[in-house]
């Protein structure tokens, strides 16, 4: 990546990945998760603290060309906030609903654990998520293009 240009991956169709979130794995590797127009979230890995990166590939997580965010929690697990919806690859965008939270131990296998918003009115977008000192997750996102919504997530209460 140079001068903020999109990362070009390899595959049957070019992977144009933007807006990365960085995860730090227990073994020291870094992983980025990125939004795409390829109907899935893109990923790339680094074993040298970001000096070099693997080829960008598509994950199994759906993406409708809408923003995502991810965070590595203090216990080493990873959290992803995203719209759990795929568009046809190459289409501009899909409905920005539902807005979901997924968890992963390895950054590869993601399990949806919570739906924050799910309405045909749509437009739950540009999420951001962090883990607070209290261990809870704190998320903000655009709500129906009308306001910013805040949500606190206590993972101990999710089965």
Residue ranges and their predicted role:
Residues 1-159:
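Asp-box/BNR beta-propeller blade signature and adjacent active/binding-site loops
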